[in-house]
């Protein structure tokens, strides 16, 4: 079967933003105008199509990235085209900082992105986080300044903030006409026309008009800036422009596209998705400026099993190449079971194919293939390069795995997932639910790599670990709704770490004689602290065979067993290196086990000698508050051992930046609400680990001893 849409007509893009910038509303309008949904879902009614999980509808925030395929034809005349020529695969990503992992996963498989800003708040902390993630994956993007109907909306302030906060060059291509209640439409700077929405058809049609006299000077000024940015992309166009000739409309669009794809600048337009103004120009701009799969550089992968990970195997959007794709999300569907969302980078795939999971080295059979529309699905038999589809029936595939043709294996991407910073103990209310709870937690962990489930070896309790209170709240809620398990949860615990503060040398001898052959091993080791974030390393400096080679893995195993449970309070040990420099063995009584025990006991002694200390996660907190509450809020943050690093005006409020230990931030939202009569808001994300003050460290050790 041939493909319906040529590859240059595909746009795979994500919609990303800070929480409450109106991202989901934007997606909803796109689905409405492209004819995918017949009525508009509103977030504040809990009816948005993209927010399909029950918790998302209740809380009005997006938790999982829903993938949707829809179609659009760029139009000039105020009506939507009958025969759409472009295929849009849209991923709506969450804006809440606890779900950053979802954004990370979707950016890895997108070609472009639309960043939605709140016209009043501008570039907010999570916008910056997402922007940095997009920079890491080199994703070309454009900006839609949304909520231009809001009090305090300021388009040009947002343009300045994009440049100040992200370092990107912002180039407006469409300027809103009016703001707040006066918002009428926008000026298209490329064609120099007004787009106006007035009808009662929910913004589905619009009219074009010449630019009114009162706006001409401003439009000319911004058009000049846009053209200057565009002609920098081409020497001939630059020469023409310097001679007084402006590029025509098709040339201008081509130059703007070239600069956007090269990440030289970011096109910006404004509007209000909620008021149905400015969404069609945004769709046109997606087609004009964001990349098709053909515009993306080759995806370089490495051969499975190559420890060097030499990326010398190329894959590109070409149906004739060998099949390769990336599983970027696992989702449980109540009707179909487990769905694996997959981006196809090269080749084609048919229902019933047997493919290779190159990351795990296992074969998978494709049971069913679906094109997803939020959570409705359309069964398909064949998929092509550039498609984003859902596969049912895969058994061993998890997030970040590469799927490929068996006869031409490749591993494309290794995604990085952050370590959890918060944990809670969880147990089912009835013993009968234990099995159901374990299965449910395992399913949730397969969907979300930033969520871990472990069993506490001493207490036997099940421990849930995640990225924040909201993250764990929602997972407990999903246990109840999706797996029908009522659970009791403990108070949140901080994920402390242990490390050492100075170099130490330790010698430990393990001897055991109990009739017959005994156990004997002696190790001499040097423990050295490393820079924060460097992790752990081990080296053997044994010369002359004082410890035979076959026993050295036992030594490393003993060291690693202490890493999982440090000597102070049983927390994982990080940022240190160990060198094995000498030792002794016995021909009969030595064994791998004896050296493992010697290394373990030696590590425990050595860590005390090396000044073992507790570390705690420090969160980067930003509070945005009306000015009158600033003093009280700063005082409260300081009392939580917070260090205020700065404050600045943000719109008509003040933004306070601060570093605070996570241990002191539990339940902060309630304190903040009561201090500010509900008007302040905050975001926080993990920043680094710091040593715990001695008096608090003593308390923690006493508690966990």
From Swiss-Prot:
One of the Pfam families matching this protein, by short name: EFG_III
A GO biological-process term: ribosome disassembly
Gene3D superfamilies linked: 3.30.230.10, 3.30.70.240, Elongation Factor G (Translational Gtpase), domain 3, P-loop containing nucleotide triphosphate hydrolases, Translation factors
Subcellular location: Cytoplasm
GO molecular function: GTP binding; GTPase activity; translation elongation factor activity
Main location: cytoplasm
Family matches, as CDD domains: EF-G (cd01886), EFG_III (cd16262), EFG_mtEFG1_IV (cd01434), EFG_mtEFG_C (cd03713), EFG_mtEFG_II (cd04088)
GO CC entries: cytoplasm
InterPro entries reported for this sequence: EF-G-like_DII, EFG_II, EFG_III, EFG_III/V, EFG_IV, EFG_V, EFG_V-like, G_TR_CS
Domain tr-type G: 8-294
Assigned keywords, A-Z: Cytoplasm, Elongation factor, GTP-binding, Nucleotide-binding, Protein biosynthesis
NCBIfam families: EF-G, PRK12740.1-5, small_GTP
Family: Belongs to the TRAFAC class translation factor GTPase superfamily. Classic translation factor GTPase family. EF-G/EF-2 subfamily.
PANTHER family listed in its UniProt record: RIBOSOME-RELEASING FACTOR 2, MITOCHONDRIAL, TRANSLATION ELONGATION FACTOR G-RELATED
Name of the protein: Elongation factor G
The organism of origin for this protein: Roseobacter denitrificans (strain ATCC 33942 / OCh 114) (Erythrobacter sp. (strain OCh 114))
Source lineage: Bacteria, Pseudomonadati, Pseudomonadota, Alphaproteobacteria, Rhodobacterales
Gene field: fusA
């Amino acid at each position: 079967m041939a493909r319906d849409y040529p590859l240059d007509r595909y746009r795979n893009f994500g919609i990303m933003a800070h929480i409450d910038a109106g991202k989901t509303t934007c997606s909803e309008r796109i689905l409405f105008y492209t004819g995918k949904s017949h009525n508009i879902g509103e977030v504040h009614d809990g009816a948005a199509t993209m927010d399909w999980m029950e918790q998302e509808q209740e809380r009005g925030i997006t938790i999982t990235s829903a993938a949707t395929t829809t179609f659009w034809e760029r139009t000039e005349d105020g009506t939507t085209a009958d025969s759409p020529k472009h295929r849009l695969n849209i991923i709506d990503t969450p804006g809440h900082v606890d779900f950053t992992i979802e954004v990370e996963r979707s950016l890895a498989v997108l070609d472009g992105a639309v960043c939605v800003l709140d016209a009043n708040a501008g570039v907010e902390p999570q916008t910056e986080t997402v922007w940095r993630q997009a920079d890491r994956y080199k994703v070309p993007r454009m900006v839609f300044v949304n909520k231009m109907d809001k009090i305090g909306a300021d388009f040009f302030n947002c343009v300045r903030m994009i440049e100040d906060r992200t370092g990107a060059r912002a180039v407006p291509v469409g300027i809103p006409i009016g703001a707040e209640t006066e918002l009428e439409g926008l000026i298209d700077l490329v064609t120099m026309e007004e787009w106006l929405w007035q009808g009662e058809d929910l913004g589905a049609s619009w009219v074009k008009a010449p630019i009114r006299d009162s706006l001409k000077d401003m439009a000319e000024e911004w058009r000049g800036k846009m053209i200057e940015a565009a002609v920098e992309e081409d020497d001939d166009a630059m020469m023409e422009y310097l001679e007084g000739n402006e590029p025509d409309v098709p040339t201008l669009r081509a130059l703007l596209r070239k600069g956007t794809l090269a990440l030289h600048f970011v096109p910006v337009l404004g509007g209000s998705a909620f008021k149905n103004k400015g969404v069609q120009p945004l769709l046109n701009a997606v087609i004009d400026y964001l990349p098709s799969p053909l515009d993306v550089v080759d995806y370089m992968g490495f051969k499975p099993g190559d420890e060097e990970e030499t990326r010398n195997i190329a894959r590109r959007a070409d149906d004739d190449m060998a099949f390769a794709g990336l599983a970027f999300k696992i989702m449980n569907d109540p009707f179909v079971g487990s769905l694996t969302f997959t981006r196809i980078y090269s080749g084609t795939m048919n229902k019933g194919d047997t493919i290779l999971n190159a990351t795990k080295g296992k074969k998978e059979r494709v049971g069913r293939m679906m094109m997803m529309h939020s959570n409705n699905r359309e069964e398909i038999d064949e998929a092509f390069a550039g498609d984003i589809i859902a596969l049912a029936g895969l058994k061993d595939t998890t997030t970040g795995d590469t799927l490929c043709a068996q006869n031409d294996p490749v591993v494309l991407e290794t995604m990085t997932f952050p370590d959890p910073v918060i944990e809670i103990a969880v147990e089912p209310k009835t013993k009968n639910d234990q099995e159901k709870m374990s299965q449910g937690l395992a399913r949730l962990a397969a969907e979300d790599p930033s969520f871990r489930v472990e069993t506490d070896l001493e207490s036997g309790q099940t421990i849930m670990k995640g990225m924040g209170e909201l993250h764990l709240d929602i997972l407990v809620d999903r246990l109840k709704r999706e797996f029908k398990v009522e659970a009791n949860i403990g108070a949140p615990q901080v994920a402390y770490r242990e490390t050492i503060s100075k170099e130490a040398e330790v010698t430990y001898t393990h001897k055991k004689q109990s009739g017959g052959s005994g156990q004997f091993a002696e190790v001499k080791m040097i423990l050295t602290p490393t820079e924060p974030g460097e992790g752990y390393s081990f080296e053997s400096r044994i010369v002359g065979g004082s410890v035979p080679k076959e026993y050295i893995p036992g030594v490393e195993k003993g060291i690693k067993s202490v890493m999982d449970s440090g000597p102070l309070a049983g927390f994982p040990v990080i940022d240190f290196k160990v060198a094995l420099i000498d030792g002794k063995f016995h021909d009969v009584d030595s064994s791998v086990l004896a050296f493992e025990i010697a290394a373990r006991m030696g590590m425990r002694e050595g860590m005390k000698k090396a000044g073992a200390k507790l570390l705690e996660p420090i969160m980067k907190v930003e509070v945005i508050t009306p000015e009158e509450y600033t003093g009280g809020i700063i005082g409260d943050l300081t009392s939580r051992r917070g260090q205020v690093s700065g404050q600045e005006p943000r719109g008509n409020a003040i933004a306070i930046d601060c570093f605070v230990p996570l241990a002191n931030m539990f339940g902060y939202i309630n304190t903040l609400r009561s201090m500010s009569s509900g008007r302040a808001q905050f975001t926080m994300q993990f920043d680094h680990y710091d040593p715990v003050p001695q008096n608090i460290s003593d308390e923690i050790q006493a508690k966990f001893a």
